[in-house]
From Swiss-Prot:
Modified sites of kind Phosphohistidine: 249
EC number: 2.7.13.3, 3.1.3.-
Localization annotation: Cell membrane
Assigned keywords, A-Z: ATP-binding, Cell membrane, Hydrolase, Kinase, Magnesium, Manganese, Membrane, Nucleotide-binding, Phosphoprotein, Protein phosphatase, Stress response, Transferase, Transmembrane, Transmembrane helix, Two-component regulatory system, Virulence
Gene: mprB
Species for this entry: Mycobacterium leprae (strain TN)
Name under which the protein is recorded: Signal transduction histidine-protein kinase/phosphatase MprB
Domain HAMP stretches: 186-238
Cross-referenced InterPro entries: 2C_sensor_his_kinase, HAMP_dom, HATPase_C_sf, His_kinase_dom, HisK_dim/P_dom, HisK_dim/P_sf, Sig_transdc_His_kin-like_C
Residues in the Cytoplasmic compartment per record: 1-26, 185-519
Protein function: Member of the two-component regulatory system MprB/MprA which contributes to maintaining a balance among several systems involved in stress resistance and is required for establishment and maintenance of persistent infection in the host. In response to environmental signals MprB acts both as a membrane-associated protein kinase that undergoes autophosphorylation and subsequently transfers the phosphate to MprA, and a protein phosphatase that dephosphorylates phospho-MprA.
Domain Histidine kinase: 246-466
Reaction(s) this enzyme catalyzes, per UniProt: ATP + protein L-histidine = ADP + protein N-phospho-L-histidine
Amino acid sequence: MVRFAWRRRASLRATSSLSLRWRVMLLAMSMVAMVVVLMAFAVYVVISAALYSDIDNQLQSRAQLLIASGSLAADPGKAIEGTAYSDVNAMLVNPGHSIYTANQPGQTLPVGTAEKAVIRGELFMSQRTASDQRILAIHLPNDSSLLISKSLRPTEAVMTKLRWVLLIVGSLGVAVAAVAGGMVTRAGLRPVGRLTEAAERVARTDDLRPIPVFGSDELARLTEAFNLMLRALAESRERQARLVTDAGHELRTPLTSLRTNVELLIASMAPEAPRLPDQEMADLRADVLAQIEELSTLVGDLVDLTRDDAGQVVHEPIDMSEVLYRSLERVRRRRNDIHFDVQAIGWQIYGDAAGLSRAVLNLMDNAAKWSPSGGRVVVTMRQFDPSHVELVVSDYGPGIPPQERRLVFERFYRSTTARSLPGSGLGLAIVKQVVINHGGLLRVEDTAPGVQPPGTSIYVLLPGRPMPVSAYSTLADQDMGEANFQDKIGPAVQVSGKSANFRDSAHVISVDYQSARAR
């Protein structure tokens, strides 16, 4: 049994080591050979049955002709002798056991048990094959018995020739099938060969050029899918290279400044070095802490962007009002000199809680950064339609020029006025990435068009559904109730101005988006 299993595994290894072209060709040959064998067998059986049936018909016709002519009764010897000039053997046995025979040269009509039973009258008729002859025995009404036989050698010769013809034709058919299968396989697998060469080229040279697509069959679709994979790989490498380049550039500046300040601090602490004034020492320490915080923020933003690019989004039901509340608590700790006016509704979204929290926090941070001390930031979350919620974060800062509204969502982009302020240039890029991953839309408008400063309002449209009443009440009870929630986030106010419309607003700047399935 072990030896049999080993042989089976060896056979499987040998089969799997064959190329796809050889396997397809062998499969075609096997199928054609099977069809040829079945067809040859069917032809042989049909022709053989027809020939032997024809011999039986001939014997019966001869017997009926002799019986109908009456010559067997008038002159049986002459009647039987006349059959010698044909291709049959004949024998007549009378009741008195007189026997008349006429045989072909070299042949003798065999008489066996079946024929003897007919002669004795036990059987009316019998047919059988014996000694390469087909024998017919008939018991006549006058108690005579007529036996006629015919040699099967001519028929067997025909069948032998037929076997050879079928063998030769079948072999030629299998050979032609092998050649045709090889040609068809080569032509059919040519696109697969191109795909293989392209994959090897990518692995060897990092060449991501697409493969030409011919036709519209399954292999063409496979080629198109491979080209899509190549394009996605090229875009991923481009994004990775751009991210590494931009990150290196953005990290170099704070690291250089941090190194300079640290070296200055170390030098000032040397035994014989002149001591810096206390105010300068405090400023240096504050600068070092600020630069460390800037580096931490930049690294965190890079990690968030990398995670969003990889598509590692965990979908779970999220209460957006809870996300809004937690983000507001964090941004208030950073900018307690800004007054936040918030109006929120219960809204449930299926998505990434961490990503949405990061996006909302970045929107509020951005609005607070551009607001003067004592300024006001308005945050409104309202139902836009039965399946979408609109989040609006508005400030009354200097605003964003129309020509820069697309650029502010690009990675590391910072306008001329923003370069003097702290930040990595990644905050709004993270917002855009999170909104896209959740199937949302983004647009930018002036908060107060025609007024100086115009301010900035960023509109976010996200899919979802109203928060179920029972679940929302539970969350409210869990977080000290709706009244305490309003006390935490400040009084709820209605944002001034007419309601924004994502489709008909005059100052809409579309940002790249992609649709996503709302869960």
